[in-house]
Amino acid sequence: MPQDAPAGLAPGFLVAAPALADPNFNGSLVLMAEHHAQGALGFVVNRPGPITVADVLGGLDAGLRERAEGAGRADDLVLVGGPVQPERLWILFRPGPAAPEEGAVALGAGLALGGSRELLEALVRARDPGPYLLLLGYAGWAPLQVEREVGEGAWVPLPLQGDLVFDVPMEKRWETAVRRLGLDPAGFLVGGGGAEA
């Protein structure tokens, strides 16, 4: 049965219904960063890409790559944040005493988001920056598109919970989100939709 889409989906999560056939979003957990009359913006937080943090940093500065290697972060996979602007780098991190705040937007629940080279460099150079994820690309929705998709049952909204991003292993994030909705992943069936590619 279709449900009414909530007025404000960000900050929060969208949990993809199993019937969502779009290969960019099947089985995905999307962190919604913006939702307004002009559309919506979010990031898939459970889809690893083919490159590592070292690959990204090596293209910027060899010293940054060495710093990431020393911190044990060089082999972390960069996530595919979505199909829009797949070359654009975003940084999702947990703000803390050593994490920079300039150039970032606080989302709530212990999460912040930015996209500048300066922010990335500051996080990598910080003595103890806390957890962070690098994402390439984002998911975008036209005006009223995400509301329609939620109403059709392609996505189920979930309130923002920072631990889903940094304390739950990437391969368990979707299943954990489904269970937090009070649903059984094996029996969770609805249909349709997909963000802009």
From Swiss-Prot:
Pfam families: DUF179. One of its GO terms (cellular component) is cytosol. InterPro entries: AlgH-like (IPR003774). It comes from the Bacteria. Belongs to the UPF0301 (AlgH) family. HAMAP family: UPF0301. This is UPF0301 protein AnaeK_4073. It comes from Anaeromyxobacter sp. (strain K). The lineage of its organism: Bacteria, Pseudomonadati, Myxococcota, Myxococcia, Myxococcales.
